[in-house]
Amino acid sequence: MINGKFKSRFAKQFAIGLGVALAASTFAVPVSGAKQAPSAAAKNDLTIMIGEPNGGWCNQDSPGVDQIAAKNSVFETLTILNSDNKIVPYLAKSVTGSNENKTWTITLREGILFHDGEELTAATVQMNLMANLGIIKPFTGKGQAASLPAIAWQGIMPTASPAQWAANVKIISKYVLEVNLGVKRPNFPYTLWNVGRPTILSTKTLQDPNCGNTMGAGTGPFMISSKGVDQFTTVLKANPNYWRSTPANKLPKASTVTFKVVGDAAQRVNALRKGQADIASFGATSGQQLNLLKTLKDKITLIEGPRETTWSFHLNATALPFANKDAREAFAQAFDTDSYTKLMTKGNGSPAYQLAVKEHPYYQPKGTLKFDLAKAKASVAKYTATTGKSLDVVVPINTTAESLKGAQALCKMMEAAGMKCTIMSPVTSQQYILRGFGLQQQMSLFNVVAGRSAEFANLFSTKTNLELSGFRFVNPGLAKCFADAAEVDTRKAYSTCVLELQAQSYWVPGYVEGGFLAWTNTTKGIGTTPLPGGGVRPIIGASGFDVASVTKG
């Protein structure tokens, strides 16, 4: 549960950041006024094209997947996910749990320097945890106010006073600190990575009002040269003191990295073909362009990351029509995930028959309603008989062409089942998210179930103001079920909750996707790279790729 004094400002600040994280990670972002992309620069200068506009990189910001990849080139995490899907220490040398996983001891690697010369110590991490909790500004008078990360961190380590803070995070020695949680968290090392979000920043960066906007010092392979001045261009330069660099393998390989924002996927493909970009990222709904890239194997390499992100429709259960179970079932039975996925991804996504992929703790193979037009019509008739109203569906959209295309397809399905369906006027992703959290629209299409951990999804299925279906009001026992299950964090623990979520059709699965990365044949070094904590880093993952090893040749 969220502390009341934080709650009112969380939803707004969270939505501002998360509008990109949840919407733009898949749907192309239209960019007007973007400058013409320059030709990819000299041998050691990389140009990477992404679809997501500039976003904040500080602790309380919520960038989307493209910006996370850029951010992780500058700032790094205490732990990281390897290619075996295991969380291993990264900036940390070890992370050890005790006291039923309520107490965690973090031991840091020694000698790691931030870009501004500060050494990574327990005191630095303590300050970062204060920033993660959203208490750095009220406690020190400097830094960011609370937003999404604070919701997550306050949920596991409530901290409202200096006395609580002193008890929660203790410095044991220069490189060792102890973190005391308010609940059991067996997956706390994942929380320290959390898809590349909780990065570690220098103390001066955390206290600077421009933290993550125009400045920032991290421990990563690249340093900020220019950010936030041109919303479509971020320029990074090599860190000469990078901690992973060795005499035998000097890192980073590139001298500079320029991230260029180009919202149109077709333009990103064209830039790769013309040598105006070395690397570009894509979402599954850029299906036509992805299929084109597959025909250019002699010039361009295309790889898909793990297909583990499930997009679902969160139906607002606090008001008609979806306060009525018959209406929710009619929607679920009328939705044809096979045809929807084929239309939207052109073979680059998968139909979603459950709320999560098999590797996710929320996965339950039974319980979701499947496409059945006859049953959908029967549910519509039952709704009308019960309420005396026609079943009128209103679909919200953002400003992208893909969003409109998806809504039009959805309306055709609903109308085939006997419902009336209209599409709302387009709004920005930020406005879409704000309305969703305010339960001011009938449904919200979100990708909250991703990867192989329940940590992020739990924010949207427990009693927080981020829960998009409003079942925390109409079915509070379900929200408590998820909160209790999180303390065990196993599929078995979540099973009762997920089966109820599916049985009530609060969430209706849409489609599954993975991220795509493409690079020219003159770009070298993209691949799995060794991790100091064990295993190798995936070629592409939820937090991007190892840009430190990339160059041209």
What are these regions (language model features)?
Residues 184-252, 256:
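Gly/Pro-rich hinge or "lid" segments in bacterial periplasmic/extracellular proteins
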Residues 210-217, 242-292, 420:
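Ligand-site clamp/hinge motif
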Residues 107, 142-203, 228:
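Surface-exposed binding/hinge segments that line
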Residues 51-71, 91-93, 118, 183, ...:
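A structural "hinge/loop" feature
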Residues 93-145, 178, 321-323:
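Aromatic- and charge-enriched surface segment that lines or borders ligand/interaction sites
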Residues 222, 350-383, 397-405:
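Structural transition elements
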Residues 232, 334-362, 401-411, 430-553:
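Detector for C-terminal structural segments
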Residues 49-99, 130, 217:
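N-terminal lobe/hinge region of extracytoplasmic solute-binding protein
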